[in-house]
């Protein structure tokens, strides 16, 4: 399940980046 792991990692990274972006944009 390499593809699943890569997809999950990308999803997690994207979600974290989105949270950081929202934190910066809400300023």
UniProtKB/Swiss-Prot annotation:
Topology versus the membrane: Single-pass membrane protein
GO terms of molecular function: manganese ion binding
Claim: Acyltransferase is one of the keywords in the record: no
Transmembrane spans: 1-13
Gene Ontology CC annotation, any one: chloroplast thylakoid membrane
Name of a matching Pfam family: PsbY
A biological process term (GO) from this entry: photosynthesis
Keywords (A to Z) from UniProt: Chloroplast, Membrane, Photosynthesis, Photosystem II, Plastid, Thylakoid, Transmembrane, Transmembrane helix
Localization: Plastid, Chloroplast thylakoid membrane
Keyword Plastid: yes
Stromal side: 14-27
Family, similarity comment: Belongs to the PsbY family.
Task of the protein: Loosely associated component of the core of photosystem II (PSII), it is not always seen in crystals. PSII is a light-driven water plastoquinone oxidoreductase, using light energy to abstract electrons from H(2)O, generating a proton gradient subsequently used for ATP formation.
Assembly and oligomerization: PSII is composed of 1 copy each of membrane proteins PsbA, PsbB, PsbC, PsbD, PsbE, PsbF, PsbH, PsbI, PsbJ, PsbK, PsbL, PsbM, PsbT, PsbX, PsbY, PsbZ, Psb30/Ycf12, at least 3 peripheral proteins of the oxygen-evolving complex and a large number of cofactors. It forms dimeric complexes.
Protein name: Photosystem II reaction center protein Y
Record gene name: psbY
């Amino acid at each position: 399940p390499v593809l699943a792991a890569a997809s999950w990692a990308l999803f997690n990274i994207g979600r974290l980046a989105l949270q950081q972006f929202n934190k910066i944009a809400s300023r």
